[in-house]
Amino acid sequence: MKASLTRLFTEDPLARLARGNPAFVKRYESEPDPFGFSLETYARWEPFFRFLFEDYFKVEVRGIENIPAERPGILVGNHSGLLPLDGAMISMAMTGQHRAPRRIRYLVTDWFFSLPGLADWVKETGQVRAT
C-alpha cells in the first residue's frame, strides 16, 4: 500500500495512465480536442475518480457491452445535488471496463465555467457547457 501511494504522488500521471490503460491513452494522446479535454489533466485526476468508482461508491456496471465502440451515443444519468458525479462514474466505467475505452463528455452548468481555477479543470477533464 505504501509503495503504491508513493508511486501515485511521484510517478508521471500520463505514464501511469498509459501503463494501466494503454488503449485509452493511445486513442486520445495525439487527438486535439475542440472542447479542451487534456489527457494529462485527466491522468492526474484519474486515481481520485477511480477511488470513488471502485472503493467509495462501489459502482456496479451492467449493460456496458451495449454502448457502441465507435459511433456516437447518448448516455443519460440522473443526479441530485450540485456535483455531476454520475457523469464521472460513467466516464470511469467507459475508460476502464468498455471493450474500446472511450472519453465521455458530460454536461455541466455554465456556472462551473465562471469559477476562477475551476473553469479550466472542468474543460480539461472532459466536461462540456450545458447551455
Which residues fall in each region the model found?
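Membrane-anchoring hydrophobic helices of lipid-metabolizing enzymes
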Residues: 1-130
